[in-house]
Design a protein with these regions (language model features):
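A structured, charge-rich N-terminal accessory region that forms the first stable segment of a protein
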Residues: 1-6, 10-13
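Surface-exposed beta-loop interaction hotspot
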Residues: 91-150, 154-156
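Short amphipathic beta-strand/extended segments with alternating polar/hydrophobic composition
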Residues: 35-37, 72-76, 115-117
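Histidine-centered metal-chelating micro-motifs
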Residues: 78-79, 83-91, 165
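Short acidic-glycine-tyrosine-enriched beta hairpin
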Residues: 67-83
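A short glycine-rich, His/Asp/Glu-containing loop-to-beta-strand
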Residues: 10-41, 135-169
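Short, conserved beta-strand element in jelly-roll/cupin
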Residues: 47-63, 156-161, 169
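Long alpha-helical, hydrophobic tracts
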Residues: 42-47, 69-71
Length: 169
């Protein structure tokens, strides 16, 4: 399905899918931190009370502050936040080149530790060929070969120069 206006500066935009109970979102903090808020729709006291979250930064440098602990998340880096984190805030290091956090959040049944994942730590998989203009690398940030999660997997595709398209991972 199509989610429009996912990355708007100074905003957190979340979409809940009833199909998998997944929440997809874009977070672009500028002058103020942007915090996850539970709301009545989730029926919990705090956003990650029964959920886990992954965030990949596709923008400038930023930070994720989890229960007071600061994680510096640079471009093309990710963070996994385990179930039970009570406070989560996103910030950017620069208003001119803000962080752009792509997030996925899924129900969880177990708590795994919060962890930052660099692009070097992600599991890369090269796919495609030049003849079909789809040479690309999928960096698996949240994947069983990288770290444990309840059910959340996340990656980022990087197209090589001259490549024009990607398939669904």
């Amino acid at each position: 399905f199509l989610i429009e206006n996912l990355f708007c500066e100074g905003e957190m935009n979340l979409t809940y899918s009833h199909i998998d109970r997944i929440i997809v979102g874009g977070v672009v903090p500028t002058t103020q931190p942007l915090a996850l808020m539970a709301g009545k729709a989730l029926g919990v006291d705090f956003f990650l009370e029964r959920r886990e979250l992954g965030a990949i930064n596709i923008g400038g440098a930023g930070k994720v502050i989890i229960d007071g602990e600061v994680f510096e998340i640079g471009p093309r880096e990710a963070i996994y936040i385990g179930m039970g984190a009570k406070s989560v805030e996103f910030t950017s290091d620069s208003v001119e080149t803000p962080a752009r956090f792509y997030i996925n959040c899924a129900p969880a049944h177990h708590t795994y530790p919060t962890r930052k994942i660099t692009q070097q730590q992600a599991s890369p998989e090269k796919l495609g060929n030049a003849e079909n203009c789809n040479v690309r690398t999928i960096y698996k940030f949240l994947h069983p070969s990288v770290l444990p999660t309840c059910q959340l997997s996340m990656g980022m595709t990087v197209l090589e120069p001259g490549s024009l398209w990607n398939t669904m991972p």
